A protein has these predicted regions:
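One-carbon transfer enzymes
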Residues: 1-256
Length: 256
């Protein structure tokens, strides 16, 4: 499986995630390779992304860059319209990544909204920090919505990137209870900030394992993407591949 990796490379987490995926490729857990890394920043724009680029090069992975900021300043005025700008920008991105023929692209800390053409041409997946059917928005908005709705479970999902933000078909997901003994006393408090932080801590601990296990499952054919539908190993249509148990095992290993 040829994997295209999209990342702005804006922080340490971006480097850690790439390292985690690359380690899984090298160990044979992910049956494939990272064919290229694309970034919407270019060398010299920011210290953190420069560190990210150094890591990519150290892995001998082809690095493709197109600065969205510089693209804005070098194109005509009508690119001030966000939708038109995204279309033209991502058409240029496509020209640069097309030769790599990725089977799958993952948005791993990519801070731009992908235009419709690109996400229809390639199977692209993204992480959303909520259970399937859960709240949309940022991770902060998701957690406050879970608390407000007195939800029983939290989690995260990997979904297909579609024009409808955070609502593409669910590829995989993991769930965990937020009503057990660990959480109970914080639900009873008027100040829900500790509960908020606790839910975030447990959700965040599951993000990297969910991402790498999803890539592993896709590379092994345990779950597949066919014409925008999610299929299991028997060829049956499913509403997402439940990786909760495997993710929990990874979380326990990482805590040791």
């Amino acid at each position: 499986m040829n994997i295209g990796w999209f990342s702005t490379g804006r922080d340490e987490a971006a480097r850690q995630l790439l390292q985690a995926a690359r380690d899984k490729v090298r160990s044979g857990n992910i049956n494939g390779k990272i064919s290229f890394v694309f970034s919407n920043r270019e060398p010299g724009e920011a210290k953190e992304s420069d560190l990210f680029f150094e890591l990519v090069r150290s892995y001998n992975i082809p690095l493709v860059c197109l600065s969205h900021k510089r693209f804005k300043t070098t194109k005509e005025e009508d690119l001030g319209i966000k939708k038109e700008w995204r279309i033209k920008y991502h058409r240029e991105v496509n020209k640069r990544i097309e030769p790599f023929a990725p089977d799958l692209c993952i948005l791993a800390g990519y801070m731009l909204i992908v235009n419709e053409e690109l996400c229809q041409k390639y199977d692209m997946i993204n992480l959303h920090p909520a259970p399937p059917g859960g709240p949309t928005g940022s991770w902060q908005e998701v957690i406050w919505a879970l608390i407000e709705n007195e939800a029983d479970t939290a989690g995260a999902m990997m979904h297909l990137v579609t024009p409808e933000l955070d609502r593409g078909p669910v590829v995989s997901y993991c769930l965990f209870s937020i009503k057990g003994e660990l959480f109970a006393k914080y639900w009873r408090k008027d100040d829900k900030n500790i509960l908020f932080r606790l839910i975030r801590q447990h959700e965040l601990a599951r993000e990297f394992p969910l991402i790498t296990l999803t890539l592993q499952s896709l590379s092994r054919g345990e779950v597949s993407i066919k014409n925008g539908k999610i299929i299991d190993a028997q060829g049956k249509l499913i509403s997402g591949y439940n990786l909760s148990c495997k993710v929990d095992e990874e979380v326990k290993k990482n805590l040791k």
